[in-house]
């Protein structure tokens, strides 16, 4: 963990709310973020599994990708130059998990891509959002307009009771299916809502104008089922669910196949598919899909109360 230096850290629109709720604030991806509240990481983790937790993920990047032709299909074709996923197959009102790859097939970042009817809406990782934007501009500026949305916050409401909670503020919420995404009214605010998340639970991610984020967060926290949840529990929840964290489980030296993410590469982009290849790193990734590759990502238990830090050498004294 980096040493705390709030003088150089950015703050999300919910920073004052976190402090008022007694959050322990730590540096993360250039932001002063809540790692936990007084309830502690374990209780926050279990509460999300049993009820509903509210996460501030406003540090993540939100980007609009709009084709200069005005056709969302052209934006999809352009983005398919940079990711191995079938973006043209994402119907309006739906979203898909994807990865930016480099020439060697390594992962530059992972992201969500939503089709909003006349443009694509991307959510990228906080630590990579500036390089992702630069990558998009360098590769696609001749075909697309790239518009970051720094004036929007992003909230994640996660857990088995997330639907019943959000339904009180958004009448459309119960009808949304997993990975549905699009503009919705939430408490009268103009939001972008997806039925998704990164905890392994049912839930919703809500993009809201930054100036309205605290009011919306307070409305959600006023529900008895909802507790504020920090990044510590977000990390343990995604790890328990087997979800990758960029920079830890995946990076530029790991291909999607080596990361056991081949499930995210649709048939249309594979060998023999309708639009096979054509993305950065296609030669390596398609060869691995066809011939196999040893997995670089594994999950195992440590029989100790302390967590292993990133980069430490793991030794098993009883490995067969």
Located regions from the model:
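Acidic, proline/glycine-enriched N-terminal capping motif
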Residues: 1-100, 106, 231-232
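Conserved, structured C-terminal
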Residues: 2-27, 33-35, 115-320
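Short amphipathic beta-strand starts and helix->beta connectors
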Residues: 44-50, 100-110, 139-142, 185-192
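Acidic active-site catalytic centers that drive phospho-/nucleotidyl reactions
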Residues: 56, 110, 205
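Residue-level marker for the onset of beta-strands and adjacent loop->beta junctions
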Residues: 61, 96, 109-110, 180, ...
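Well-ordered mid-protein domain cores that form the structural environment of catalytic cofactors
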Residues: 81, 85-139
